[in-house]
Amino acid sequence: MGQTVTTPLSLTLDHWKDVERIAHNQSVDVKKRRWVTFCSAEWPTFNVGWPRDGTFNRDLITQVKIKVFSPGPHGHPDQVPYIVTWEALAFDPPPWVKPFVHPKPPPPLLPSAPSLPLEPPLSTPPQSSLYPALTPSLGAKPKPQVLSDSGGPLIDLLTEDPPPYRDPRPPPSDRDGDSGEATPAGEAPDPSPMASRLRGRREPPVADSTTSQAFPLRTGGNGQLQYWPFSSSDLYNWKSNNPSFSEDPGKLTALIESVLITHQPTWDDCQQLLGTLLTGEEKQRVLLEARKAVRGDDGRPTQLPNEVDAAFPLERPDWEYTTQAGRNHLVHYRQLLIAGLQNAGRSPTNLAKVKGITQGPNESPSAFLERLKEAYRRYTPYDPEDPGQETNVSMSFIWQSAPDIGRKLERLEDLRNKTLGDLVREAERIFNKRETPEEREERIRREREEKEERHAPKLPWLFLIISP
């Protein structure tokens, strides 16, 4: 028992059913092999200190998440479901993760407590001698007379909950009279989700948050969910910085999937998102494939119109996002929409495209395998994760690897019984033992010199007789 070493990565693999359940709660699906690849091969290259064996350090997870969610070509939309699930494991750990969670995150919450005593000084300026003119204005009471004469509108504005916009540390020199009246009336309102979207790249993420702060559905200061639609700048940036669905369905599908996960949009938001990023024909194809993915009570795909319309309606449903039932409907709807995007993005079988995927000179075998699997998903109807397709993927991996790696893989003993994982490990070993460019130049130079020595003409000794 004491000889086995448990790492965060091995721990998640031992509890893979729980990991899949947690991912499902985040409205995403994760695959075990991609989980291992991203943790051990991809995220360590982000230069944030991510170990190859994984970690539950929340700071490192947040740094990797920032890299994954980076806009434009520097982002990794295909890795969003995996880092979101890692984050959920660390911030809301199940019992088998709690012993491994770093105890460092609680201290970042402490600075927020000392910030509370900063509020009383805000109420002192009205009593300060620096503002003597404010005292008579309060005693004269001109405002109550105006409010009573004007009737309801202004009274309603003052009695309603304040809008959810944060006053970011206002200087005490301006409008202290207004803040002095608003502060005792209630607590400071929550920050605006719309402002949070605009500040997202400047402010670090909150330590106790498990997901992105850019939510259309957000709990406001009165404890009720508040709705914030997509901004036009968000939609414009998503459309202009990504290829069309017909050109690269995988990339746009990954983008929409990440938006559905982080923003948790309503039914109307989903229609707006699809209408902006897809053409009319592409949208109809996605909706058709999503309705095909609806399953009945027996867990199998159903074609009953009432069940299909109940799960994936084409007309605006009466799902209230303020109720748990309405939110459950929206989660299921978004899952079906992701399935529709994935199925609609599959092109007709084109094995020539798959054969055209070859390993780059400096590309790791793990990264090459991911590109190869993506080609299978995009250009064939086959699932590369299906055990029945492992032989085909293995042969493609051998034949399309770099020449030096492919030759050594073909010479392996008992090649027929080697699994794809065995081939990848052997390819990684060969890749890591490759000679550097300097070593290669030195070897070529030595071989050239040896060849010249072997082919140099052997001249007989000439004895010169010099006569006196």
From Swiss-Prot:
SUPFAM superfamilies on file: Retroviral matrix proteins, Retrovirus capsid protein, N-terminal core domain
InterPro entries in alphabetical order: G_retro_matrix, G_retro_matrix_sf, Gag_p12, Gag_P30, Retrov_capsid_N, Retroviral_Gag-Pol_poly, Retrovr_matrix
Marked site (Cleavage) residue numbers: Y131, P132, F215, P216
Sequence motif LYPX(n)L motif, location on chain: 130-134
Motif PPXY motif, residue numbers: 162-165
Record motif PTAP/PSAP motif, residues: 111-114
Keywords associated with the record: Capsid protein, Host cell membrane, Host membrane, Host-virus interaction, Lipoprotein, Membrane, Myristate, RNA-binding, Viral budding, Viral budding via the host ESCRT complexes, Viral matrix protein, Viral nucleoprotein, Viral release from host cell, Virion
UniProt-listed Pfam families: Gag_MA, Gag_p12, Gag_p30
Statement: the UniProt record of this protein carries the keyword Lipoprotein: yes
GO biological process, one term: viral budding via host ESCRT complex
GO molecular function terms noted in the UniProt entry: RNA binding; structural constituent of virion
Lipid-linked residues (N-myristoyl glycine): G2
Keyword S-adenosyl-L-methionine: no
Region (Disordered) residue spans: 111-222, 434-455
Entry GO CC: host cell plasma membrane; membrane; viral nucleocapsid
Note: This protein is probably translated as a Gag-Mos polyprotein.
The protein, known as: Gag polyprotein
Origin species: Moloney murine sarcoma virus (strain ts110)
